[in-house]
């Protein structure tokens, strides 16, 4: 039986190390700007994708300009007024300015949200989950539940990893296709909503890392004694530290995955 004990006892420690490593790595990458997240991917977006969609957007801007005129003016002889013409021209100017400023605006949003999230994380004194000191009885209990803890740690770590990295990929796509969305401004009601939708999505995806950082800090402050009497936990032989760490990991993974939904429901963006 000794080989079983020696084989299962490190599983709890392995789960703790996997979770802390993946969470620290994901937070470090998630709080960085897309430019520093992957310089090669950002170079592809900045040098190829963005100019490509910008060229298409310049053509689409002219098309939506004529569509906007046709939609706002039913009878050119009777309905074409100076006010209508000025309104459409202002939209064209804004669209042209926006097409050439999408990258600057995106970089500004990325830097603001990344800096804010980093400040929140540094001031929150986040350290990850702790293994704690185990006596002989607790070590035996942790040996039994070590497999379950390791599985929970791997699943939660994978959820956080996929969520944060998919968010970063979406930020690259948002910066690239931004000119197409902005070119819809002169299209009139309905079509011009694409520009607003792009801005809302950019803000949601960018600000979600701030919500994630705050949520992780809040969850790390939880303790089982907040929900159960301390005497009850000390009198019953329970792997309290293991249960608390599993609770923190599952709640953190759920919060990271639901950050976008929280932003949409709370701020309507």
Task: Indicate where each model-derived feature is located.
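Alpha-helical transmembrane segments and their helix-start/interface "positive-inside/aromatic belt" motifs
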Residues: 1-11, 83-99, 195-206
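Binding/recognition "hotspot" determinant
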Residues: 1-60
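Non-cytosolic segments of integral membrane proteins
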Residues: 4, 8, 94-182, 212, ...
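Membrane-helix interfacial "entry" motifs
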Residues: 39-51, 75-88, 138, 142, ...
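Hydrophobic transmembrane alpha-helix segments characteristic of membrane transport
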Residues: 60-96, 177-192
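Short alpha-helical basic/polar micro-motif
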Residues: 67, 87, 163, 167, ...
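Alpha-helical transmembrane segments
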Residues: 183-200, 262-269
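Surface-exposed substrate-engagement region within the catalytic domains
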Residues: 204-209, 213-214
């Amino acid at each position: 039986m000794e080989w079983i004990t020696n084989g299962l006892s490190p599983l709890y420690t392995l789960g703790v190390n996997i979770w802390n490593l993946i969470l620290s790595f994901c937070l470090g990458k998630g709080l960085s700007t897309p430019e520093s997240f992957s310089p090669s991917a950002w170079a592809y977006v900045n040098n190829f994708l963005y100019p490509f969609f910008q060229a298409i957007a310049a053509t689409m801007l002219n098309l939506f300009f004529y569509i906007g005129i046709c939609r706002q003016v039913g009878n050119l002889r009777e309905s074409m007024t100076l006010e209508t013409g000025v309104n459409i021209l202002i939209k064209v100017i804004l669209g042209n300015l926006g097409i050439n400023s999408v990258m600057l605006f995106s970089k500004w949003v990325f830097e603001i949200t990344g800096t804010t999230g980093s400040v929140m994380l540094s001031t929150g004194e986040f350290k990850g989950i702790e293994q704690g000191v185990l006596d002989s009885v607790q070590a035996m209990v942790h040996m039994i539940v070590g497999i379950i803890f390791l599985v929970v740690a791997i699943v939660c770590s994978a959820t956080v990893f996929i969520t944060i990295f998919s968010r970063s990929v979406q930020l690259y796509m948002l910066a690239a296709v931004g000119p197409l969305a902005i070119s819809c401004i002169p299209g009139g009601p309905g079509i011009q909503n694409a520009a607003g939708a792009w801005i809302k999505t950019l803000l949601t995806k960018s600000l979600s890392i701030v919500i994630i950082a705050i949520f992780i800090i809040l969850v790390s402050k939880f303790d089982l004694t907040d929900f159960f009497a301390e005497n009850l936990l000390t009198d019953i032989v329970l792997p309290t530290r293991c249960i608390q760490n599993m609770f923190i990991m599952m709640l953190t993974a759920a919060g990271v995955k639901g950050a976008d939904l929280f932003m949409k429901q709370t701020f309507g963006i």
